[in-house]
Structure formats: C-alpha cells, structure tokens
Regions:
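Flexible, low-complexity linker/loop segments at domain and module junctions
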Residues: 1-8, 93, 97-98, 292-298, ...
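A glycine- and small-aliphatic-rich helix-loop capping segment at beta-alpha/alpha-beta transitions
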Residues: 21-27, 113-128, 178-181, 201-214, ...
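ACP-dependent fatty acid/polyketide chain-elongation machinery
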Residues: 1-67, 89, 246-258, 353-367, ...
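Glycine-/small-residue-rich "gating" segment that lines the acyl/pantetheine channel
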Residues: 125-132, 173, 177, 193-250, ...
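Acyl-CoA/ACP chain-elongation machinery
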Residues: 183-229, 262-276, 306-313, 330-381
C-alpha cells in the first residue's frame, strides 16, 4: 500500500507571547519573554509566584458567553486556536467532506481549574454534594476536540491523546497516520493546556520542577544555561491543519510544509526524570528519521524539548550528539520554551508551529536568557543563543517528552 503524502495547510496559535500565529512568530524572533507575576490568583504563599500566562485574552470575543461558562479554559483555548487554523487553511466548510475530517487533540491534564474549583467548593460545604452539572464535561480531557467537531460538524476520528507533555505531538503523529493510510483527508490537530492554577503551581512546586527565580521572572526560563533551576509553567494552544497533499493541491491551498514522519519511544526508566544518557530520546529521534526516510545529515534545525531543567537539557543534547554525530554542530538547535514557558500538553503543537514558521521565514528563533556556559554541554553545538539566526531550513525536527517517559518526535520538510 502506497502511503499518501501529508502537508500542513493551516496554523493557529494562542500563547503567552502572542494571541495569533503572526503575533507569536514576531515575539519569537524578537526574543520576547512571556513570563511575569501570576495574576489569576494570589500566589504570595507559593514558592513560585510567576508563570507564562496569556495576555489580554477575552474568550467572549470569540465564543458565545453561554458556551464560555460551559468550558474550562483549556477548551476555550482550543476553540480559538483551531478557528484560526481553519481560517488560515481557507478550508471551505460547505464543500469539504466532513465525514473525512477529524479532530485529534492533545492535553496532558485537561480541565484542572474546573476540577480544583469544584472540589474546593465541595470541601468548603457541609458535605452535601452540590456540583455544577457541567463539572464532568468541562473537566475531561477529550472535551476540547468534541467541542471543535460539534462547532464545525466534523465527523471523522475525534479524540484526545494524553501523554503528559508529549500529548499534542502524539496527536499530530496519529493524525499523520490516519491521513497517510487514507482514512481521512483533513485533520485538525494540536493541543491545549490551562494549568496555571493553584493546583497546577502547587503540584509542580511540590515536586521541585519549577524555577523559583521570583526576583526575575523574565529570565527564569534559561534552557542550557548552567544556572537553570526548573521550568516556567505556561499555557495556551497550538492548532495545525494536516491534509492529504493531493486534496490540498486540488483546492489550491497554501502549503507550509510536508510532514515526513513521526517517532515514538519510552524511557522505561523513571516517573519524572529522564534517563541520564538520553536512551529513550536517542531511540525516538532514530525512529522518527527512519519513519521519514531521512538521514541525520538531512536535518537543519531542531526545536528541542529544552525545559530549562538541570537533568533534562543535558540528557537531550547528549542524545542529539549521539544521533547526529559530527553533523550535530551544523544544526540550529533552540528551545522556544525560553520565551513561552512550558505549555505541557500543548508544547508539541506550539513548538512545531515555531519550527514550521522557521522554515517559512528562513529564521531560527533564539534560546534566550543564556549567560553561563554549562560545562556538561558540548560547546560545539549551535544552541542559537540569545539572538535569532538566519538559516535556510529545509528539514526541521520537533522534540517533545513527557512525565512517564513518553517521547515523541516529528519531522517537517519544506515542500520542493
């Protein structure tokens, strides 16, 4: 069976540094940080008092007020980003066969704020069970793609992948394979997350995962820097329209890139820590290259998982050196989490959009906030430090890893 070619025809982004894909890109290349003091709740008693929140986001500008009240923020974000991507793809909803259009989404946690608030309300009462009737449908992780499909009438495959921070990359790989195998013509894919809540901040603080650089939030996310002390929690959504190449060509769609392949692996090592030698990361990148039919020397750019954690950054770069050998020093490596923070289940989608736009514009966004060299990192690697670099990117890789040892990797290629 001959596999169909799959391309990207639409992008949508709602991030801490920009509420559209164009705003997001402009902020990326200018090296803008999205971190600042938490405004959603009083964080004075928390170890970490800052995060990468969305700015100036008003859901009722995009979604009916009645529906907003029935959606957790992670679903609101999904609706807005997917609408932008569908419009960007110029998909004619009156013409497309909706039975062959799916929605495959990623969310690592889902409706955390809804769960938190309902439980707190119950705990504050006398034990009488008084719950919002929308508690469950607001909270469950699969509800975001459900709402997207209901709005647009898409009747193809519809579900959420949950693999912590690898969730939206897993969703993209599933979407890629459904189209490759001929089961769908178009899939709305991506991911969303809204974990900047008391429970989210408190939980990650309890496991010592977050930076506590409260005196300087904007510089706290510093991947690959020797003084990094944890990630900065972010939120938002990224949406990508994947489409059969012939279907896209027939309707005259703009094509951003071809999706050449995806790879998956497991660390099988520790619940939250990476293998120190990056064994699972080595496997996932090799799997992705094999799936795409590429050689290591074909890759020009890697948007790393790069969370700004002491263990994770070193393990990933060790793995890159192992997989790419001498060619590793020729690759523009970066971590856009230095600007957006860590969007958890939405990270894979948002960072894939950054890699795709790097190909389109011929510019690789920087890894900001780097000032102290880490002696455990190969000095020959080009980590695109502090300033964007011009680069003719033909092939870009996006790495995403999640708690539980989940590893996902996607490869994109500029269309010839």
């Amino acid at each position: 069976m001959e596999l169909r070619r799959v391309v990207v025809t639409g992008l949508g982004a709602l991030t801490p540094i920009g509420n559209t894909k164009d705003e997001y890109w402009e902020a990326l290349v200018s090296g803008k940080s999205g971190a600042g003091p938490i405004t959603y709740f009083d964080a004075e008693k928390f170890k970490t008092k800052f995060a990468c929140e969305l700015k100036n986001f008003e859901p009722t500008k995009f979604i009916d007020r009645k529906l907003v009240n029935r959606m957790d923020r992670f679903t609101q974000y999904a609706m807005v980003a997917s609408d932008e991507a569908i419009l960007d793809a110029k998909l004619d909803l009156n013409v497309v066969d909706k039975l062959r259009v799916g929605v495959i989404w990623g969310a690592g946690i889902g409706g955390l704020e809804t769960f938190q608030d309902e439980v707190l309300n119950f705990a504050a009462g006398d034990g009488t069970p008084r719950f919002n009737p929308f508690f469950i449908p607001k909270m469950i992780a699969d509800i975001a793609p459900g709402n997207i499909s209901i709005k647009h009438g898409f009747m193809g495959p519809n579900y959420t992948t949950v693999s912590a921070c690898a969730s939206s990359a897993n969703a993209m790989i599933d979407a890629l394979n459904y189209i490759r195998l001929g089961y769908c013509d178009v899939i709305v894919t991506g991911g969303s997350e809204a974990a900047v809540t008391k429970a989210g901040m408190g939980g990650f603080n309890a496991m010592h995962a977050l930076s506590t650089r409260n005196e300087s939030p904007e510089t706290a996310s510093r991947p690959f820097d020797a003084t990094r002390d944890g990630f900065v929690l972010g939120e938002g959504a990224g949406a990508i329209i994947l489409e059969d190449y012939e279907h896209a060509k027939a309707r005259g769609a703009k094509i951003y890139a071809e999706v050449l392949g995806g790879g998956l692996s497991s660390d099988a090592y520790h619940m939250t820590a990476p293998h120190p030698d990056g064994i699972g990361v080595i496997a996932v990148m090799k799997n992705c290259l094999d799936n795409a039919g590429l050689k290591p020397e074909d890759v020009d750019h890697i948007n790393t998982h790069g969370t700004s954690t002491p263990l994770g950054d070193v393990a990933e770069l060790k793995a890159i050196t192992e997989v790419f050998g001498e060619h590793a020093k020729n690759i523009n490596i970066n971590s856009t989490k230095s600007m957006t923070g860590h969007l958890l289940g939405a990270a894979g989608a948002v960072e894939s959009i950054a890699a795709i736009l790097a190909m389109e514009h011929g510019i690789v966004p920087p890894t900001i906030n780097h000032s102290v060299v880490d002696e455990n990192i190969d000095a020959q690697l080009n980590l695109t430090l502090n300033k964007a670099q011009k680069r003719d990117v033909r092939v870009a890789m996006s790495n995403t890893f999640g708690f539980g040892g989940h590893n996902a990797c996607v490869l994109f290629k500029k269309l010839d």
